[in-house]
Amino acid sequence: AAIKKKNYDYDQVYTLGVSQEFLKNKVKLTSEYSTTNNQDDRLRARIDVRANDRYSIYTGYEFSELDTWSSNKFVVGNRYQLNDQVSLYTESQRLKERDSKANLQSYGMDYSYKGNHSLNLSYQEGAVKEGKEDYDRQAISVTSTYTKPLFRVMNKLEYRKDYGQTQDLDQYVTTNSIAYKTSPSFRIVGTFDYSITKDHRINQNVEKNAEYEIGWAYRPVTHNRFNWLGRYTYIENEGNLRAIDSATNEKTHIFATEGS
């Protein structure tokens, strides 16, 4: 599935981060470690080297470990600032999870328009191994981000193709989010994610996933020790659509709130 289920409980999260620059600000080191309920651990580390005003290279590592799942991600990339608005980049990724691993190469362009509107175009290709299955992947995506002092909107469209000896899948994914600060004390966020997967071997859609979510945070400026958080989520997953007798259709409503 393209959309993974999240942990919708409000848990205690501890985060420690470090950022330092060296050699007259040409080298930057950033790292962050977080743990949730002293069980779920995440580690991020990255080094950026600025060769000149236009060209930089970077490498990074990410590690996540949950109760029943872990992942490792290693990246090496470089970026060239073509002008004040356009930058080009390439990136190599090595991903490893419990039952899968991938070697992917990405090529992209970032375009900034009037400072508050940015557009990203990305193409990705590589090899993926899941269990005993090996297949190739190609993906192209377009991401638009619009930012103002009081709100932020992000929309992403992605087309992904996985093909090999045992599968020939097309997947269409859209990811959308909005955040709006109605006042210094109140913020609203919303997300909408949707994906559909088609199997060309049988010329049929085999999976659909949708997730809608709205959340809010209330932290009075005059009483900053008080916090009220809330979230409503609707999830709909349809799997194994190729066989009616074994198809699954899951619909879930989740409401969570917390005050302190």
Model-derived features: positions:
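Gram-negative and organellar
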Residues: 1-260
